[in-house]
Design a protein with these regions (language model features):
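Hydrophobic anchor at the beta1->P-loop junction of P-loop NTPases
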Residues: 8
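P-loop (Walker A) phosphate-binding loop of NTP-binding proteins
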Residues: 11
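ATP-binding Walker
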Residues: 14
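Walker A/P-loop
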Residues: 17
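Conserved substrate/cofactor phosphate-moiety recognition/catalytic segment
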Residues: 21-66
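Glycine-rich phosphate-binding loop used to anchor ATP phosphates in small-molecule kinases
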Residues: 61-103
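Conserved phosphate-donor/acceptor-positioning beta-strand/loop module used by diverse small-molecule
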Residues: 89, 103-122, 155
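Small-molecule kinase domains that catalyze NTP-dependent phosphoryl transfer to phosphate-bearing small molecules
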Residues: 124-168
Length: 174
């Protein structure tokens, strides 16, 4: 397998963090950049506008751009040192665009189980991690209909055990 930069995204409960972490551990020299870890580095001064109907997430464009730039620079540094790179998590289009200003993504995968499955998985999460039915439904709709994700290879993980999903992702990398 040649060196790669892999993007794994999908709605909450799709398995992206679990797949990325376990896949990275199976490879010889790999890093897993979790987008949530980078987003959560913003401790204060986080712009949120819940009243903007054009931006239901509430995130400002500059924050998405900054997160994308940061992930892109981090991924580029690891790739230059010979690491395979997995970027996992939810990012919007401006963030992905900024990631790709710094590094080319070899493969883009969208884990997209059926809505009923992500709702079920979210309900099984600890309260401080659960998003709730309404948010999970909206999140799933975004990934199902946003034209930006047409360039991602879709993988329905509804009935896949994690190991089966990892095997499918590995096959896509060959």
């Amino acid at each position: 397998m040649n060196q790669f930069v892999l993007a794994i995204t999908g709605p909450a409960g799709s398995g992206k963090s679990t797949v990325a972490e376990k896949l990275a551990k199976q490879l010889d020299k790999c890093v897993n950049i979790d987008a949530d870890h980078v987003k959560h580095m913003i401790v204060s001064g986080f712009f949120v506008d819940k009243n903007d109907p054009k931006n239901p997430s509430g995130w400002g464009f500059n924050q998405w751009g900054l997160v994308g730039d940061s992930i892109g620079l981090l991924a580029s540094n690891f790739a230059k040192s010979g690491y395979d790179v997995i970027i996992n998590g939810y990012l919007d289009e401006p963030a992905w665009t900024n990631v790709e200003k710094h590094i080319s993504i070899t493969k883009k995968i969208l884990l997209l189980p059926q809505l009923s499955k992500v709702v079920e998985r979210d309900a099984g999460r600890p309260a401080d991690f659960a998003m709730g039915h309404q948010s999970v439904t909206k999140h799933h709709e975004t990934f199902s209909s946003d034209s930006y994700y047409r360039n991602f290879t879709k993988l329905d993980t509804t009935d896949h055990p994690i190991d089966e999903t990892i095997a499918a992702v590995k096959e896509m990398l060959h």
